[in-house]
């Protein structure tokens, strides 16, 4: 990643007590993946390099967008890597990704987002993960997850909220509902007439009384 980011395990970086090291996600094992496909009846019967079953090629649509430079590159990498195990990836790299997402026209939707803009974990779950979340484009639904987030909403102790955030992340990881790729190391550039700008993990807190534009 050339120091531009760190591999992600969960939704939050390790700077949070409930971040990366607090949860576990499956590692990528291509040989085991091939084995699982074969056990499910997906094999390459026509020699084109892709698994097929009952005359149908194993093909998925990968939805992303071009305004974040890393997104098309990630799609290309997935296209190459998944081909090695027999899965065809058709990339839809479009500025109109939101429309496709809302219409459910994807198998994998990859986007970038700030999961804790105010330094609190609840936002990510309520906006993206719970059953009625506005950005739950994959229609993931788990009563167990919803109950955890309801409890988080009613809990004010920071340590307890952190524990619930760990439990919630582990739930969606165990359900294979979401996967996380990287946590970016962001760089800030300002003009010479800007002073008092200090980088902060939560971008709301970069706007302070010391920030001045002359």
Where are each of the predicted segments found?
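Sec-exported extracytoplasmic/periplasmic mature domains
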Residues: 1-5, 17, 38-43, 80-87, ...
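Append "and occasionally in soluble cytosolic enzymes with long acidic Gly/Pro-rich linkers
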Residues: 1-77, 167
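Solvent-exposed loop/turn segments at secondary-structure junctions
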Residues: 3-7, 16-19, 66-70, 96-98, ...
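Stable alpha-helical elements in mature extracytoplasmic
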Residues: 8, 29-36, 70-74, 78-81, ...
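Short, solvent-exposed loop/beta-turn-alpha elements that line the ligand-binding surface or hinge
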Residues: 18-35, 45-58, 102-104, 124-154, ...
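A generic structural signal for short
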Residues: 21-22, 66-67, 86, 137, ...
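Ligand/substrate-recognition segments at binding pockets and active sites
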Residues: 44-115, 186
């Amino acid at each position: 990643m050339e120091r531009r980011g760190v591999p992600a395990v969960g939704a939050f970086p390790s700077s949070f007590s409930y971040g990366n090291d607090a949860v576990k996600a499956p590692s990528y094992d291509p040989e085991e993946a091939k084995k699982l496909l074969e056990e499910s009846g997906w094999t390459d019967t026509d020699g084109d390099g892709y698994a097929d079953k009952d005359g149908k090629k194993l093909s998925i649509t990968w939805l992303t967008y071009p305004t974040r430079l890393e997104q098309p590159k990630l799609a290309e990498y997935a296209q190459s890597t998944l081909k090695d195990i027999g899965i065809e990836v058709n990339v839809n790299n479009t500025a109109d990704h939101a429309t496709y997402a809302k219409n459910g026209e994807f198998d994998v939707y990859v986007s970038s987002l700030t999961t804790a803009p105010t330094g609190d974990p609840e936002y990510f779950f309520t906006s993206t993960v719970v059953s009625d979340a506005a950005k739950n484009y994959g229609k993931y639904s788990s009563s167990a997850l919803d109950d955890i987030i309801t409890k988080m909403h009613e809990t004010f102790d920071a340590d307890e909220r952190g524990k619930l955030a760990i439990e919630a992340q582990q739930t969606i990881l165990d359900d294979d509902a979401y996967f996380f790729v990287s946590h970016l190391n962001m760089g800030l550039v300002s003009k010479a007439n800007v002073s008092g700008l200090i980088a902060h993990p939560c971008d709301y807190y970069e706007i302070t009384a010391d920030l001045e534009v002359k």
